[in-house]
Amino acid sequence: MAKVRIYQLAKELGMETQELLELLDQMGVAYKSHASTLEEKDAEAVRELVKEQRGLQEKLAEEERRKSLPRRPPVVVIMGHVDHGKTTLLDYLRKSRIAEKEAGGITQHVGAFEVKTPQGTVVFIDTPGHEAFTTIRQRGAKVADIAVIVIAADDGIMPQTEEAIAHAKAAGAKLIFAINKIDLPQADPEKVKRQLMERGFVPEEYGGDAIVIPISAKTGQGVQDLLEMILLLAELEDYRADPNAEPRGVILESKLDKQAGIIANMLVQEGTFRVGDYVVAGEAYGRIRAMMDADGNQRKEAGPGSAVQVLGFQELPHAGDVVEWVPDLEAAKEIAEERKEERKAREEEEKARRPRTMAELLRAMQEEGRKELNLILRADTQGSLEAIQHILARESTEDVKINILLAQVGAPTESDVLLAQTANAAILAFGVNPPGSVKKKAEEKGVLLKTFRIIYDLVDEVRNMVKGQREPQYKEEVLGQAEVRAIFRLPTGKQVAGCMVTQGRIPRNAEVRVLRDGQVIWQGRIASLKRFKEDVREVAQGYECGIGLDGFDDFREGDVIEAFQMVEVPA
């Protein structure tokens, strides 16, 4: 940009001229009047400062605006090992006999419902397993604020418990641990707490920050404490939403009903949806014909935190699809079609660039600016697993941290693939063969899945790739010094220093710095190095030479020219 007058810049920035003059005073920029001309660099500095100040003001204003919004209920997902009491807890919470209706007490479908207490409302999402929860997260939707991990007091932490924890953490949910079945004679809550501490979750009663609540979903003991803790955590996190914003929600589940047609279970996150609204969710679109809550009550509108069933989609939306309000049917159709085309193009692109080696995975990780290498480990025995973990724990570097999301005995599962896709992780299997369906799933999702028969083959591959990914470390190596003893000026006006090399050597291609009274006054490169008017590549200690520098013309007798180079430190 060219020079600009102060009053012109004020107009450009939408400021009063006096306001800009005051800003220039603060910046120490000299001027005579509002008609004075600013140098290009000063004008650009003003633009940047004003932009920064306005950005900060907007951020503060947005924070203040959010604080003035009404609170929304926390959204909670209940996860854990099969038969540890997830459905029984949900059943107790909503006071319906769902646990008896469902086969074997295992949840069959995703549901969402509200629990109203004197302290506030909590929205519970019921997933058939953490796979569905992770699938929702993969589609970019932050659904649950809090994950309650249910652990049976008699069984303790099981493989599915660890998977549930890993999936909840990958989804960015806050964790609460509910130790269930404390009414049983064989219950051992302290054992569960010890197991949690072994995994880095220290309960609050022992000085940590892990929230652990003992409960009995069967009798209801401790369930009120759990609800109070959920609401306390929600108050600390300060969940808020704007009921007047443009409506937005997320699909939890969809199904085709013989009588009603397509039914979508939706959680409203912002704004208020109303019957008659046109909506688009992923590649599906439609007009809301009816909304019902979890109890089957008809709703004309649904605001933030509401969980409702929606009728009116033309085709099945997917779990995790974001539901958006659109002005009319034509816009809904157009957006859905565009997304179909975008998906096809994206699938082709992803197919072409799926990581097939650890190096490719690391390269992708570096391009994203991540500093962690996420791994899922599977092994044939607990001993092998512990040995691999123990060795890998020492292989993290300052540049790349090895982060083991999940480590379990047994072959990789489809659940592992979903977690790996969500967290951009690699699955490394030792001494176990993944089933064909898992290999196929990994190929479809672009997840790196590798098997090993020798522990050190696995460790060496990770070690070499991490080392190859580290930022190179350099140290300075001084090559030599030359003392300026005479100064000559060429016909071109440029100075040349007549020097004596007093230490080491001065190479022609080295970087140099000029020292005066021990202080660095300039740093750059040599423009010319001569002996008796002949260009030379290098001058050794004890010899005289003439040195011209690229961009420096202020030599004084007694100055020292020091040559140096940066040398990479071996890994």
From Swiss-Prot:
Pfam families: EF-G_D2 (PF22042), GTP_EFTU (PF00009), GTP_EFTU_D2 (PF03144), IF-2 (PF11987), IF2_N (PF04760). Keywords: Cytoplasm, GTP-binding, Initiation factor, Nucleotide-binding, Protein biosynthesis. Its main location: cytoplasm. It comes from the Bacteria. Belongs to the TRAFAC class translation factor GTPase superfamily. Classic translation factor GTPase family. IF-2 subfamily. PANTHER family: TR-TYPE G DOMAIN-CONTAINING PROTEIN (PTHR43381:SF5), TRANSLATION INITIATION FACTOR IF-2-RELATED (PTHR43381). This is Translation initiation factor IF-2. It comes from Thermus thermophilus (strain ATCC 27634 / DSM 579 / HB8).
